[in-house]
Design a protein with these regions (language model features):
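Chalcogenol-based redox active-site neighborhoods
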Residues: 1-167
């Protein structure tokens, strides 16, 4: 069982955080228009999964804004912002913040067990049921080439390390 922390207190995750070198498990999520999005549709591109608890927290919102700015400069790369927020809340945030280079995806239906397969489901503590802050980078062939499980949920991910995996 992987662990992270929330405000200094240990938090358990359901299962093990995903490793590099394996084929990324496919998943289905919900887009803002309530249509489905499948990871398998991204083959041929680099994919950055920016995974976080909720857009209603400052650090999560900051990570989406930063990845949005970075995504504008990346070629052949998609950035997916993944949380359990409802698609309506994600859409409102993206509209208000001018987010145009990141695709917000909701795992609220969880038909493909993304949270368990990637080892990012928070299993206990005050954020139980939400997703742990993490970043996963997938290459155009569908292999995971970079992962970061942020050790403290209240901290931002290492943006530069994620981008370095793509270059």
């Amino acid at each position: 069982m992987s662990k992270t922390a929330f405000k200094g207190s240990p938090v358990n995750l359901a299962g093990e955080f995903i490793n590099t070198g394996i084929t990324a498990p496919d998943f289905t999520m919900v887009k803002g228009d309530l249509s489905q999005f499948k990871l398998s549709e991204t083959r041929g591109k680099f994919v950055v999964l920016n995974i976080f608890p909720s857009l209603d927290t400052g650090v999560c919102a900051t990570s989406v804004r930063k990845f949005n700015r970075l995504a504008a400069k990346m070629n052949n790369t998609m950035v997916l912002a993944i949380s359990k927020d409802l698609p309506f809340a994600q859409g409102r945030f993206c509209t208000t913040e001018g987010i145009e280079n990141v695709i917000p995806l909701s795992d609220f239906r969880n038909p493909s067990d993304f949270d368990v397969n990637y080892g990012v489901l928070i299993a206990d503590g005050p954020l139980s049921g939400l997703l742990a802050r993490s970043v996963v980078v997938i290459n155009p062939e569908g292999k995971i080439i970079y992962t970061e499980l942020v050790p403290e949920i209240t901290q931002e991910p290492d943006y530069e390390a994620a981008l370095a995996a793509i270059k």
